[in-house]
Swiss-Prot record:
Example of a GO cellular component annotation carried by this entry: plasma membrane
Quaternary organization: Heterooctamer of two A chains, two B chains, two C chains and two D chains.
Location of the region described as Disordered in the Swiss-Prot/TrEMBL record: 278-314
Gene: cyoA
Periplasmic side: 24-42, 108-314
UniProt entry keywords in alphabetical sequence: Cell inner membrane, Cell membrane, Electron transport, Lipoprotein, Membrane, Oxidoreductase, Palmitate, Respiratory chain, Signal, Transmembrane, Transmembrane helix, Transport
Protein name stated in the entry: Cytochrome bo(3) ubiquinol oxidase subunit 2
Signal peptide range: 1-23
Membrane topology, from the record: Multi-pass membrane protein
The protein's role, per its UniProt record: Cytochrome bo(3) ubiquinol terminal oxidase is the component of the aerobic respiratory chain of E.coli that predominates when cells are grown at high aeration. Has proton pump activity across the membrane in addition to electron transfer, pumping 2 protons/electron.
GO biological process, one term: ATP synthesis coupled electron transport
Transmembrane domains' residue ranges: 43-63, 87-107
NCBIfam families hit by this protein: CyoA (TIGR01433)
One family name in Pfam for this protein: COX_ARM
Amino acid sequence: MSKKRYPRLFGILPFLGMLLLSGCNWTLLDPKGQVGIEQKNLILIATGLMLLVVIPVIIMTVVFAWKYRASNKAATYTPDWSHSTKIEAAVWIIPILIIIALGYFTYHSTHKLDPYRPLDSDVKPVQIDVVALDWKWLFIYPEQGIATVNKIVFPANTPVNFRVTSDAVMNSFFIPGLGGQIYAMAGMTTKLHLIANENGEFDGISANYSGAGFTGMKFKATATSQEDFDKWVAEVKQSPKKLDKAEYEALAKPSENNPVALYSEASPDQFQLIVDKYEGMNRGRPSHEEAGSKDLATTKGVESSMQPAAGAEE
């Protein structure tokens, strides 16, 4: 390839990159839940602060390379130069200030966006228990006494309290349009608190590779009005399927690309029974739930000032 063709090739590369990026989804930067909005703001702030260093370095690299090129006879030549107080001050003070700012935002966001921290709201939360299976998601509504597979429905502008575990390998529960992910582990209970600021349907995925059926381990999360949610619960209660012991054992067997399933009856204790199956794994150490309670106690002083407002608009 001749040297003349290199500039033309480099000119094409940005367009190829744009073509590839056109298929990307901007869900993380266009969230529909307050937790997701707070996380997006943190990403933008952290990226902006880091670009304060990156962009000047890139610009100076290009400028210096051009200004001090061999063919530029007008460039100042100072072979004995060794020190500049102004440069030293800039390369030390600016990064230190950026690190302090990053530390401040990161510290506050770590407590503010703690997945174990319940969202501040006057509306009663909806409780949903999540069980990761091979390769499908089981959702149990303990207060409504129903269960679903690969689909959840909840009211918009209402906090949703998720308890998450696994009856298979380690997994990760993630609804990108609403907020962050949380791991699902056998014999352990993790927690996640989310809210949808508006009605809509959101994609839910497994964010942790878990075997052959991993790519099909997806579900739909639908935020509706309270009235529509009540109607949906009534419809599920009409389903002929019941999540009894035999049905659960059949469901827990590995299977791929499972369709949505609705169960009119499910024991409120089903989630805890699944966790307790692995009781021997946790013998002699505190449960994840207890550890989370201790973490919350240590950060209680910053709880009220940094709570995401449930149902707030961006």
